[in-house]
Amino acid sequence: MHYMKWIYPRRLRNQMILMAILMVIVPTLTIGYIVETEGRSAVLSEKEKKLSAVVNLLNQALGDRYDLYIDLPREERIRALNAELAPITENITHAFPGIGAGYYNKMLDAIITYAPSALYQNNVGVTIAADHPGREVMRTNTPLVYSGRQVRGDILNSMLPIERNGEILGYIWANELTEDIRRQAWKMDVRIIIVLTAGLLISLLLIVLFSRRLSANIDIITDGLSTLAQNIPTRLPQLPGEMGQISQSVNNLAQALRETRTLNDLIIENAADGVIAIDRQGDVTTMNPAAEVITGYQRHELVGQPYSMLFDNTQFYSPVLDTLEHGTEHVALEISFPGRDRTIELSVTTSRIHNTHGEMIGALVIFSDLTARKETQRRMAQAERLATLGELMAGVAHEVRNPLTAIRGYVQILRQQTSDPIHQEYLSVVLKEIDSINKVIQQLLEFSRPRHSQWQQVSLNALVEETLVLVQTAGVQARVDFISELDNELSPINADRELLKQVLLNILINAVQAISARGKIRIQTWQYSDSQQAISIEDNGCGIDLSLQKKIFDPFFTTKASGTGLGLALSQRIINAHQGDIRVASLPGYGATFTLILPINPQGNQTV
């Protein structure tokens, strides 16, 4: 009676499994066999229809092209027809991957095209064998689908005779490797097997689930709690009975955790300060929008990448990597960070990140951009210096210029009373140096003392020409070529002529001094925009070091042995008063270009 346990098992679980075998497995396998058999036939039929459609397309595209090049010798005509028809077969086979197609000419007894030509171009001009099915197609004027070995190999070949005006001119073929067809049929078989297997497994699984309902519900809750530890969004399904109450309590707990985490994420996302977190390996794990704005890097560029790649080629020492490697935490540390497009002044605070077990899993850096604040502080300090300078210059004008005037008068009297050439030369030097001191004092006064601008209509081209007259002395013209490219269509602008002339003169003198031997200076004017005009002064002198380009507009900054360092500072102030912009572009050894952008009609009259 032992075998009766298998024929009629006592346990419900085994009975359900037996029923599944009788009610699911046998019908499923039977249906699968029928579907597989019919599917293979359907695949073959579909392939035949597709190949027939391809040859019909080729036949329509052929038209009367076989009548071309009749007077050419056989080989030349084959090449000419191939050049004419190859694009057609290439386009068709490109549209139907895996298919080979071509034309055969009965008169020439040769293959005209065989696409794709990258694979079968060497078959062009070949004559098919006497027993080739294509000859039967041409002889009987009947389409034929043939499966077997031909020029390409084992293929399913659809052939169509080319008939024009009752005459057979050749045939067209389209074929596909039977291996590709078998592979497709095998894929279909695999899918059927997978579906059948999945269906059987699902059926058995359902039976097992029903037979072990209580234990399954417990497993769901247990597995859900385990998953919840790593993935808070996990939600347990609603279960019946007491298990449902437990699952609902777990879901409520998960919801509370989700809301807490969401709040934390929102705080980080909307923080004005940049936040970047890295793991133990130094790879970026988190980056908020403020960090993107400050550093210039996008989140998708950095997350998952080493944080150190931001400054691989620099001498920058990272506080957050120091925290990660040595445990040193920094608070409000001011650093210069190498951003994407610029060096950024930052206030940085770093800390370690620990998990619930107290183990360090990474480091966090919170930073704010101090660049604007630093620039504001610098400008305020500069303004204070200038205010102090203004007060100082008022005293200098009286305390220094008056004695200098007296000294100059006495020196002139001495020069008039002496006839000694040496004394005359010495006194001339004294007068020249006194005038130089007076000029420096005058520049300081002009820079520190407000001046009411004289606004009028000014032609930039005329202004450039007037200024060049002052610069093009005989000595300068001997070594510097001046090239003027002035836009004659420019209309006058509203500006202070004398102040703009002073700006041009300052820049041109600097350009001349930057050229040590022979060189050239190019001056251009053009319409910068509908409301702005521009002047550029370009020289091929020594250029300006990148580290100095931000300083050249600072008062008293100069790299020359002589000079006050006020020329460009005053020029910038004049251009700003015109509501314009002054820009510099330079590379050491390649010269410099200063560009002045001026509005045609500034809003209001500014005082310089």
Swiss-Prot record:
It is a multi-pass membrane protein. It comes from Escherichia coli (strain K12). Homodimer. Disruption phenotype: Deletion of the atoSC locus renders cells not motile or responsive against any chemoattractant or repellent independently of the atoSC inducer's presence. Residues 212-262 form the HAMP domain. It is an enzyme of class 2 (transferase). The modification Phosphohistidine is found at H398. Gene3D superfamilies: 1.10.287.130, 6.10.340.10, Histidine kinase-like ATPase, C-terminal domain, PAS domain. It catalyses: ATP + protein L-histidine = ADP + protein N-phospho-L-histidine. One of its GO terms (cellular component) is plasma membrane. SUPFAM superfamilies: ATPase domain of HSP90 chaperone/DNA topoisomerase II/histidine kinase (SSF55874), Homodimeric domain of signal transducing histidine kinase (SSF47384), PYP-like sensor domain (PAS domain) (SSF55785). Residues 1-15, 211-608 are cytoplasmic. InterPro entries: HAMP_dom, HATPase_C_sf, His_kinase_dom, HisK_dim/P_dom, HisK_dim/P_sf, PAS, PAS-assoc_C, PAS-like_dom_sf. This is Signal transduction histidine-protein kinase AtoS.
